Swiss-Prot record:
Tissues where this protein is expressed: Expressed by the venom gland.
Keywords of this entry: Cytolysis, Disulfide bond, Hemolysis, Secreted, Toxin
Function, in words: Has hemolytic and lethal activities. Its hemolytic activity is inhibited by anionic lipids, especially potently by cardiolipin.
Protein name: Neoverrucotoxin subunit beta
Annotated GO CC locations: extracellular region
InterPro entries xref list: B30.2/SPRY, B30.2/SPRY_sf, Butyrophylin_SPRY, ConA-like_dom_sf, Cytolytic_pore-forming_toxin, PRY, SNTX_MACPF/CDC-like_dom, SPRY_dom
UniProt superkingdom: Eukaryota
Cell location: Secreted
Disulfide bond positions: none
GO biological process, one term: killing of cells of another organism
Family: Belongs to the SNTX/VTX toxin family.
PANTHER family in the record: AIG1-TYPE G DOMAIN-CONTAINING PROTEIN, SI:CH211-281L24.3
Length: 700
């Protein structure tokens, strides 16, 4: 063969002997051959060239992929510039990792079968000249083809933490290396250890090959079975062009176009590095879009999606320009300085890779700030609602007396640098407003605002822990408000916003409280304890209601009151708590330490008659009284026979207050001032057998 021969990888393209080829843009010219079919057939020499090999790589770079497929630098540049449309196994070149934080290992099976070439002394003999032929833009003609087949098994892990990528990749590689020697049992199942099975279950498989399969493998076990079938599927009839030898057309037709020059290795390396760097940015963007936090914040999701589209458009335009420059250089119309200038212009544009990576760094920081806040906030178990219409519907619910809303105030889809990129795409000759994103445009680029946001998130969580009740509801949302940096805790009272920087409820002195909603900050839902209830008390309605007068047979339990008709609640309380009850008849309501005596008929067992209990009482005989340690005092009430009693315990302050409840208002009745030493239990005395009076209560 002549010394100026050109050797190129077939890349799934349908080469045949005698076919014409334009090396300036690496395009086949189908439908035309230099010689008649009969002449080609007579002049073809075929030789057997059987071989097979397998190789494993843990890289996803275009260099390593090209090396596996024997692609030289010039053809690689054409592929990167979008000049070459690949097919068959070569589609592997287009298969890129979706995420940067993802492990990938590729197994290649390669086989060759035979080599065909045209006789070197064919020369211009039998060349078909015509006017049509003179207009065909071909620089070379195919004179040799090596046949065979490639198969690529691409194994990908799920997205993982960045610190685990290498470790998981190593585990994958160790297992995949065993594929050629893995045994398949008589039941056609792959024999693996339990540890190997755990590893292989964690990754997927994608197949690119020159073999016809009824179904492509998607799992490790599928891949093993397919791999072991490939040698039997290989043969001359199933082989495809792998490598192609071409000679210049000027050897046969002096007026034919020529491949005048090609770009130097440093320039081709710059092509590769620039395009691969953009791919790396796109993978970072995919990583970010896959983050669960981003799925919550649609504004962030929109920015990342817009950035991804902009990068795709930039990549397409850059590839198209590279393709034009490569063709011009190879045609001799321009020298390689045209490509040099292209990349210099790119460096001086907003699309320089440093700026794109800087934007991604800013966006990743925003995501991390939002994620760190959400990690704190979710411990409060709030309703996370990013639709403002749905949020305000929740706030209008009559059950929501108090709404506390942690609001992200600076999360927006607007981004000045994205606007700059978009404008530059539309008008690349215009002077951009900026070449790179500026930290001052991003609130999260400084530490003080994110730190403040986390402090407010901790406050929000503590409020939720302290006021976990039916009347106070907690929400998380995002409402853009440039006047409030980072975040705020907005307070809504019965759907109306009261404060946008809430820290704690404002509680007046317990004796002066009039608005029932102020007490409902500390609403407490209680349940009566059946194990403590005296035998004559009947509990119902989910142990919320107790009525005296039953004639049940006694049941012995060490916690049960056996003399006084009393019952305690299940939950011991410290902190601040408010509860309400409906009451009628002979009733005492208050709190007691758990250690109150249960079995005697002495004051030690009677609510209010000892140091361990405090009660507010109503009897028909004595009226309203407050009682502690056996000392009682009458309490004047403006509405005799009122039906609803409110009780507010401020354990840290040492107060226990009682209120008459009338719809939205309360009237203070009495406050005990003491020092509590342990949790107290709401407790009730209901009826009196000796006085033959009954009573009932219902916890609200």
């Amino acid at each position: 063969m002549p010394s100026d021969i050109l050797v190129v990888a077939a890349l799934g393209r349908p080469f045949t002997l005698g076919m014409l080829y334009d090396a300036r843009n690496d395009k086949l010219i189908p439908g035309f051959t230099l010689w008649e079919d009969e002449v080609i057939e007579e002049s073809t020499v075929e030789s057997s060239q059987p071989s097979s090999a397998f190789e494993i790589i843990a890289s996803d770079s275009i260099d390593d992929k090209s090396s596996l497929m024997d692609i030289e630098a010039s053809l690689k540049a054409s592929f990167l510039g979008g000049l070459v449309e690949v097919g068959g196994s070569a589609k592997y070149l287009n298969n890129q990792k979706k995420f940067k934080n993802q492990s990938r290992v590729t197994l290649q099976y390669k086989a060759t079968t035979n080599f065909k070439q045209l006789m070197t002394n064919l020369g211009t003999k039998h060349v078909e000249y015509s006017e049509l032929f003179e207009n065909i833009q071909a620089t070379h003609v195919v004179i040799g083809i090596l046949y065979g087949a490639n198969a690529f098994f691409v194994f990908d892990s799920n997205k993982v933490d960045s610190t685990n990528v290498q470790e998981i990749q190593g585990q994958m590689e160790a297992v995949i290396k065993k594929i050629p020697s893995v045994e398949i049992s008589g039941k056609a199942s792959v024999q693996l250890t339990s540890e190997e099975t755990d590893i292989t279950n964690s990754f997927s498989c994608e197949f690119h090959g020159d073999f016809f399969l009824t179904s492509n493998p998607t799992t490790f076990e599928d891949a093993v079975k397919t791999y072991q079938q490939l040698p039997q599927m290989m043969g001359k009839d199933n082989a495809v062009p792998m490598t192609v030898w071409l000679v210049p057309m000027v050897n046969f037709y002096s007026e034919a176009p020529q491949l005048m020059a090609d770009s130097s290795t440093p320039i081709l390396r710059k092509v590769r590095n620039t395009l691969e760097a953009i791919v790396q940015v796109q993978m970072r963007c995919n990583d970010a879009l896959d983050d669960p936090t981003v799925n919550l914040f649609t504004e962030v999701q929109k920015k990342l999606s817009d950035f991804q589209i902009i990068c795709d458009d930039h990549m397409s335009k850059l590839q198209a320009t590279i393709a034009k420059k490569l063709f011009a250089i190879r045609s001799g119309d321009e020298d390689e300085s045209a490509l040099v200038n292209l990349f210099e212009e790119n460096l001086q544009s907003p699309f320089n890779i440093e700026s794109l990576n800087m934007w991604m760094e800013f966006e990743e920081r925003e995501i991390n700030v939002l994620k760190s806040c959400m990690d704190i906030l979710t411990k409060a178990k709030p309703k996370v609602i990013f639709n403002q219409g749905v949020l305000f519907k929740e706030l209008y619910d009559s059950k929501v007396k108090h709404g506390l809303c942690y609001v992200f105030t600076n999360v927006t889809k607007n981004d000045d640098f994205l606007t700059v990129l978009n404008d530059f795409l539309d008008s690349p000759q215009s002077r951009p407003k900026k070449l790179r994103p500026s930290p001052k445009d991003y609130w999260y680029s400084y530490d003080d605002i994110p730190e403040m946001m986390r402090e407010k998130a901790h406050l929000f969580r503590n409020l939720a822990k302290e006021m976990n009740n039916r009347c106070v509801h907690f929400f998380v949302t995002a409402i853009n408000n440039p006047k409030q940096e980072g975040a705020g805790i907005h307070y809504y009272r019965e759907s109306i916003q009261i404060i946008h920087e809430f820290t704690k409820p404002h509680m007046p002195g317990v004796e002066t409280i009039k608005d029932r909603r102020e007490l409902q900050w500390y609403d407490c839902e209680l349940t009566l304890d059946t194990e403590t209830a005296h035998q004559v008390l009947t509990l119902s309605e989910g142990n919320k209601k107790a009525v005296s007068g039953s004639t049940k047979s006694p049941a012995d339990h060490f916690e049960k009151f056996s003399h006084f008709q009393q019952v305690m609640c299940t939950k011991g309380l410290s902190g601040r708590h408010y509860w309400e009850l409906e009451w009628s008849g002979h009733v005492s309501a208050g709190v007691t330490y758990k250690g109150i005596s249960r079995k005697t008929s002495t004051p030690d067992s009677s609510l209010g008659k000892n140091q361990k209990s405090w009660v507010f009482e109503y009897t028909k005989k004595s009226g309203y009284q407050q009682i502690h340690n056996g000392k009682n005092a009458r309490v004047t009430v403006s509405s005799i026979g009122f039906k609803q009693l409110g009780v507010y315990l401020d354990w840290p302050a040492g107060t226990l207050s009682f209120y008459m409840v009338n719809k939205a208002w309360v009237t203070h009745l009495h406050t005990f001032h003491t020092k509590f030493y342990e949790a107290v239990y709401p407790a009730f005395l209901i009826g009196d057998a000796q006085q033959k009076v009954n009573g009932q209560i219902k916890l609200l």
